[in-house]
Amino acid sequence: MARLAAFDMDGTLLMPDHHLGRETIATLSRLRERDITLTFATGRHVLEMRHILGTLSLDAYLITGNGTRIHSLEGDVLHRQDLDPQVADTVMHHAWDTRASMHVFNDNGWFTGQEIPALLQAHVYSGFRYQVIDIKSIPAHQVTKICFCGDHDDLIRLRIQLNEALEERAHLCFSAVDCLEVLPLGCNKGSALAVLSNHLGLSLADCMAFGDAMNDREMLGSVGRGLIMGNAMPQLIAALPHLSVIGHCGNQAVSHFLTHWLDNPHLPYSPE
């Protein structure tokens, strides 16, 4: 039986309205009763995740910023990784040929250059929001990650530009169809989970994980049991064809799967 369960948030544990369902919360409590360690592995900021965690009355480790930070149950930093300052400086100051909006993250919060109210819809559960600022004024040595939000085809073209400019100095991935992330080289949820599992005296084979986007690829592919959401990006399913696909986040599929796993571990699972 797995000893640690790692969960992506958006498109996985959260429903389409960006809330946690009652069944999901109850199932997470059941996992803790079985002494299974919980880990939320997300692109969201730790400041937001601490608020969400505080509403659940659950102990969980936090992998945030797509692996740039790991926090203990007590809130202590176990691991940190920032963007190379030269990479951050290039991304923030270059005039990219794109209509996508740029968003910069550091330990103090989420920063962008203009009001984009539509982006706040994903944060209604926590009330977390961006701060509008001149992005070029942000110190490059304090940046954890940078992301661009916009049309997918536009982001694909932007990724080509970023790859040419940054070469092998950063890790680029889609955390959603409409979100392209620039992360520290070698930084992803999978590498962060490896650090955390080692800290806990576990192996990745002792872990199970759930996800729906390309920023979950390394995590899902490295654990003992990786589960892909039915609403996942097609690219993720294609990249990990050997992994099982469960149901849709709107049906609280993670809870559905885990309830079966807890109650009938030796029987085959069907998402129906």
From Swiss-Prot:
CDD domains from the UniProt entry: HAD_Pase (cd07516)
Source species, domain of life: Bacteria
Isomerase recorded as keyword: no
EC number: 3.6.1.-
Catalytic reactions of this protein: 4-amino-2-methyl-5-(diphosphooxymethyl)pyrimidine + H2O = 4-amino-2-methyl-5-(phosphooxymethyl)pyrimidine + phosphate + H(+)
UniProt-recorded Gene Ontology molecular function terms: 4-amino-5-hydroxymethyl-2-methylpyrimidine diphosphatase activity; magnesium ion binding; phosphatase activity
Cofactor: Mg(2+)
Presence of the UniProt keyword Ubl conjugation in the record: no
Catalytic machinery residues: D8
Disulphide bridges, residue numbers: none
UniProt xrefs under SUPFAM superfamilies: HAD-like (SSF56784)
EC top class, as a word: hydrolase
Amino acids binding Mg(2+): D8, D10, D212
Keyword set, alphabetical order: Hydrolase, Magnesium, Metal-binding
Family annotation (NCBIfam families): Cof-subfamily, HAD-SF-IIB, PRK15126.1
Function (record text): Catalyzes the hydrolysis of 4-amino-2-methyl-5-hydroxymethylpyrimidine pyrophosphate (HMP-PP) to 4-amino-2-methyl-5-hydroxymethylpyrimidine phosphate (HMP-P).
Homology family: Belongs to the HAD-like hydrolase superfamily. Cof family.
Protein name (database record): HMP-PP phosphatase
Organism of provenance: Salmonella typhi
